[in-house]
């Protein structure tokens, strides 16, 4: 469960390494975000020469969570870390590569570009 003040790893090559969640988008007073949800975050750690800089406010989609998600067939999928991908306003990723696996639930939420760039879809 991703909420305000959660620090997440960035799973793309946009230049950010770690972000801190400012707000979970979608509804008034929404508390938690899960896989496929969009959050507003600030960059806490960045690589030199990247597209995004430290302190910049960005939108990101959650691609991996430690809590995981329940599928319709009753199975659960969970990951070792909380990770996100930084996106533009049109839901396209800012980076050109995605690192690590992503969940299949992103396909249902119309993040097709992220799914196609990911090395593995679980």
Curated annotation (Swiss-Prot):
Molecular function per GO: large ribosomal subunit rRNA binding; structural constituent of ribosome
GO terms classed as biological process: translation
Keyword Endoplasmic reticulum: no
GO cellular component annotations of the record: cytosolic large ribosomal subunit
Summary of subunit composition and partner proteins: Part of the 50S ribosomal subunit. Forms a cluster with proteins L3 and L19. In the 70S ribosome, L14 and L19 interact and together make contacts with the 16S rRNA in bridges B5 and B8.
Function noted in UniProt: Binds to 23S rRNA. Forms part of two intersubunit bridges in the 70S ribosome.
PANTHER family named among the record's database cross-references: 50S/60S RIBOSOMAL PROTEIN L14/L23, LARGE RIBOSOMAL SUBUNIT PROTEIN UL14M
Identification of the protein by name: Large ribosomal subunit protein uL14
Source organism (scientific name): Anoxybacillus flavithermus (strain DSM 21510 / WK1)
């Amino acid at each position: 469960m991703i909420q305000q003040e959660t620090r997440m790893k960035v799973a793309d090559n946009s230049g950010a390494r770690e972000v801190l969640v400012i707000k979970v988008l979608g509804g008034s007073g929404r508390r938690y975000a899960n896989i496929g949800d969009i959050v507003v975050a600030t960059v806490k750690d960045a690589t030199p020469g990247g597209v995004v800089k430290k302190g910049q406010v960005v939108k990101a989609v959650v691609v991996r969570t430690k809590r995981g998600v329940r599928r319709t067939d009753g199975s659960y999928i969970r990951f070792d870390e909380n990770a996100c991908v930084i996106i533009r306003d049109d839901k396209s990723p800012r980076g050109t590569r995605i690192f690590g696996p992503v969940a299949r639930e992103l396909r249902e939420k119309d993040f097709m570009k992220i799914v196609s760039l990911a090395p593995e879809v679980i």
